[in-house]
Curated annotation (Swiss-Prot):
Keywords from the named record: Cytoplasm, Metal-binding, NAD, Transferase, Zinc
Sections of the chain in a coiled coil: none
Binding site for NAD(+): 9-28, 103-106, 190-192, 218-220, 238
PANTHER family with a match to the protein in the record: NAD-DEPENDENT PROTEIN DEACYLASE, NAD-DEPENDENT PROTEIN DEACYLASE SIRTUIN-5, MITOCHONDRIAL-RELATED
Organism whose genome encodes this protein: Helicobacter hepaticus (strain ATCC 51449 / 3B1)
GO molecular function, one term: metal ion binding
Record lineage: Bacteria, Pseudomonadati, Campylobacterota, Epsilonproteobacteria, Campylobacterales
Limits of the Deacetylase sirtuin-type domain: 1-252
InterPro entries tied to this protein: DHS-like_NAD/FAD-binding_dom, NAD-dep_sirtuin_deacylases, Sirtuin, Sirtuin_cat_small_dom_sf, Sirtuin_class_III, Ssirtuin_cat_dom
Cofactors, names only: Zn(2+)
Binding site for Zn(2+): 129, 132, 148, 151
Protein name: NAD-dependent protein deacylase
Subcellular location field: Cytoplasm
Record has Cytoplasm as a keyword: yes
Active site: 121
Length: 255
C-alpha cells in the first residue's frame, strides 16, 4: 500500500493564530520555557506550569483550523478517488494510506477531520498521571489541581513532552520512516528542523531504500533543513501552497 507521510510543525498552525515557540510575542515570550516546560523541575513549579498551560488551552479554544489543516484532512479522498476509478477499469491501484506525524500539541488537525494523528510532543487538551499513566481529556478548560481519578496520585501533569523527558512516539516515527520505499511520498510542512532533524531522518531512511518523492513547505529557508534531501520545495505560507502541493501529490500518486 503506497503511503503519504505528512510531517508537520508549528508553521502549520501559525496561520490559525497560534503563537509558536520561537515567536517574539505571545505566551512563550512571557514565560521562561525552562520553568514551564522542564521535566526536572516541573513539580517545583507546579502552579506556574499549570497556569501557563491553562492559558495555552484558552488560546487554542479561540482559534480554528486553517485551510491547510482542512486540505490535509481531505487528502485521503483527493488522492484515492481517482485510484478507485482506475481500479474499476481493471487498472489495479492500491489505496493510499495517509499518515500524520506532528510536533504540534494542538488539536487543529483533529478538528479539521484528521484521525489517528501521531503527536510526538503530547496533546495540550489532555492531562496525564505520572504515576499510573492514566490520560484524560479536559478540552479547553482550566485544570484545577486534583487527585488522579484512577490511582489518587496528587500531582497531575500536562500531557506535554517536557525538556529532558522521554518522548515515546519518536520510536513510532523512526519506524514509519524506516519502512518507506519508492512508492511512498513525504510532505514536510512548517518545521525549522531544530527539534526534530527531519532532513537527517529522511537521509538515513534513504540509505536503506529510496523514498519516491519528498516535498517541503516552509515559510522561508531554515539552516537546519538540508534542501538537497527534497525533490520539491515551496517557501511560502502553508495556505498559499495548497494548490501546488495538491498538484505535486496528484502527479506522483495518480499520473
Amino acid at each position: 500500500m503506497p503511503k503519504l507521510v505528512v510531517f508537520s510543525g508549528a508553521g502549520l498552525s501559525a496561520e490559525s493564530g497560534l503563537e509558536t515557540f520561537r515567536d517574539n510575542g505571545g505566551l512563550w515570550a512571557q514565560y521562561d520555557p525552562m520553568e514551564v516546560c522542564n521535566y526536572e523541575n516541573w513539580l517545583d513549579n507546579f502552579e506556574l506550569v499549570h497556569r501557563f498551560y491553562n492559558l495555552r488551552r484558552e488560546e487554542l479554544g479561540k482559534v480554528q483550523p486553517n485551510a491547510m489543516h482542512k486540505f490535509l484532512a481531505s487528502l485521503p479522498m483527493i488522492l484515492n478517488k481517482p485510484r478507485i476509478a482506475l481500479s474499476a477499469k481493471k487498472k489495479h491501484k492500491d489505496p493510499i494510506e495517509v499518515i500524520h506525524i506532528t510536533q504540534n500539541v494542538d488539536d487543529l488537525l483533529e478538528r479539521a477531520g484528521v484521525s489517528n494523528v501521531i503527536h510526538l510532543h503530547g496533546e495540550l487538551c489532555k492531562i496525564i498521571c505520572p504515576q499510573c499513566e492514566h490520560i484524560f481529556d479536559i478540552g479547553y478548560t482550566h485544570f484545577e489541581p486534583h487527585n488522579c481519578p484512577n490511582c489518587d496520585y496528587g500531582k497531575l501533569k500536562p500531557f506535554i513532552v517536557f525538556f529532558y523527558e522521554r518522548a515515546p512516539k519518536y520510536v513510532i516515527m523512526h519506524d514509519i520512516f524506516s519502512q518507506l520505499s519508492s512508492k511512498d511520498c513525504v510532505l514536510v510542512i512548517g518545521t525549522s528542523g531544530n527539534v526534530v532533524d527531519i532532513s537527517t531522518i529522511l537521509a538515513f531512511a534513504e540509505s536503506r531504500a529510496r523514498i519516491g518523492y519528498k516535498i517541503l513547505n516552509n515559510l522561508q529557508y531554515c539552516p537546519s533543513i538540508a534542501e538537497s534531501v527534497f525533490d520539491k520545495i515551496f517557501y511560502k505560507p502553508t495556505t498559499q501552497a495548497i494548490a501546488e502541493i495538491e498538484q505535486e501529490l496528484e502527479q506522483f500518486f495518480i499520473s
